[in-house]
């Protein structure tokens, strides 16, 4: 059967229309699939695991926010110090954590320098605890025994057969002592002056005298063939990491010196240094920042400097509640120094976890010993 020419033309046009429609449909399908793929790529499905991970990340960020558990206590201590016109540096430890290491007030009026954690102070009689530690070290080495009479080492010492080393350490020797001058002096001459001063009673009764520790300082030198300064540097300062501690005149040229002042009619007046530092041998010519005496305490109580047995003997209270260099105040141990107008306090709790260290270059009316008791109350 033959189609006419017109029918053939209509059939070709119909095929072309079908082809065009198929092409359009194919394009639409391609665009739809591609758009869906792009949407999935731009907006991926969030799984349950990923939601959990995001929640954990948020929680972790919250956990990293540090809250100071001692902030309230620190604020109360600062307020107490300021209310009592404390001028110096305070170093406070609670549960082996330093919660305050801060200066309050003036260090050097002339140059307008304020006290801070690096300020240096002459520590006065607080030095006796350091010297007593050195004596206990020598006992552990077998070079002496605290029960030995002093004439075993210094044959010319008055009443030397009855006065024991422990009597000097505990201020029960009965010596008269000497009158300090203001000129340089050697440790040998200091000992001769003390011997010449004689005794005023038999040993055993409490009588606090610096010269007891001058004798101990000289004993350390004789037994070790070192100066007291060199022995302490090698066997106490270095192992305890007391890097800013010194002895003698270096204090007065150190830029961190906290100058001693006294108040007169509300005016600060520089307190005069009346004696050459060598006159304070063994008993009061050491200087340091508060942090260094804390490092000493930790080295002392942790066994780094002496044994536990030696520490127990050193802290055992005798006459005047005084052991060897420390007073026993029932809930804490304390050593104290007062010289010129410096007042320094070093104390730590019986469990060795808390410490209150107050170094002043201007003595307050209340005094650091009373402040120490108040601050211990705040630490409870």
Predicted feature descriptions by range:
Residues 98-104:
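Amphipathic coiled-coil signal-relay and dimerization helices
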